[in-house]
Amino acid sequence: MKTSSLKLKWLVFGAIPLFLISCNEKDENQMQVTSITIENVLDSKPLVESGTFKNSGASPLIMPNESLSFQFSAAKGQALSFVCMYGWSNDLFFAPANPGIKLYQDNGTPIEGDVSGQLKIWDNGTRINQVPGANVSHPGTAETTPKNIMEVSGTDAQGNTYAAASTLMKGTLHYDGNSTFTFTITNTSGGTSNPTPFSPGVWAISYIAGGNLLNPNPLYQNGQPTANGLTNIAEMGDNSILGTYIQGQTGIFTPLSPVLVVVYNGIDNPIYKTGENDRGKGLKELAQKGDATGLAAYLKTVIGVKAAYVLPAANTNILLPKIGSQAGGSVSQQLNVSEGDRIAIATMYGFSNDWFFATVGNGINAKQKGDFSSSIGLFDDGTAINQFPGAGITQFNLAGTPLVESKPIEAVPNPNAFTTLPAISGIIKVTLK
């Protein structure tokens, strides 16, 4: 009896390590709740492109019968704004009325040819106007109280007369293809009653979002005081201060599309693979249009995929970037994960033809915690011809229809053929908690 009891005790104690091992294995394979958050952390800018211009000859001035050109990209609804000094004046400048020179007809056809009819002469309001001409003394007499900017239409506040801007300056647009234009300024004032040189100047193109320009008055505003270095152009022909200011307003603005989040195990990243063409399972729709629903539905049928979510931002659907003091959009999702699970995400670079952000390689270890923004890359889906991001007539989110191409998926270089992007971690942030 004692022997039997002793054997039973040993059997019980001998089973304890096996029981503990079994419990440990069970604990390791138990589901764990984690939370993923994706944020648009881009400190956005309102201008997609800008620049300065001057004559390339011995003098930076554009004299009568001289011309210069500069190139830019633009989508339908965007406009070209520029300013330069009416040289033989005290504080007058040339500029189109805001928001700028129209670049596309309402049907989307690029506008070409003479657009001089959109040019005007403006008074900066900081100097008393003398009779325009070679004898104007600079800087002249300051206004006792600076006035607001106003159009000079025939005569100025002192009664001096002026020919129409369109007879002094000729503006010509040429469409170069793929949303790119060349604008040429020609000084045609030589044979008029108001001959004048033109100074170096500044030009700008505003982003457009939801049909509205982010900055419809980038260089000046009629009826408002001059600002940001415009006086230096209007009085002295010095474009450096306004050029520097506008450069600081120029950069990247892009929303992110509703985010695709996938949990998978035992397979490679199921969303994409660099070096191969789009698989035709819905990634093209995500990359071109920001629509991840088709890809999510397909992935739910793939062996090894445990869950697929499409996360729209509350109220806005898309994840907007930071705009001034307004925080960027974000989305979150609780996930049930276990040992060996991986997480992959994808979201469209909204103002592109077919670029998308996605986890690189084989995704993220689902049981880790922290900031995984460094695990995100920017990729070209290879299904649409690229244009300047945020200024492409065929970009879907700018009311365009993408132009088809067929190339392997590849990382977007930075700098790229169009612009220099911020670091990816300065655009999208991914956190697991």
Positions of PLM-derived features:
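Mature, soluble, non-transmembrane domains
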Residues: N65-L68, S73-S81, M85-D176, G191, ...
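Short, ordered beta-strand-loop transition motifs
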Residues: L11, Y175-N178
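Beta-rich interaction/scaffold domains
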Residues: M1-K2, I16
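Bacterial Sec-dependent N-terminal signal peptides
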Residues: A15, F19-S35
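Compositionally biased regions
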Residues: S5-L6, I241, G340, I376
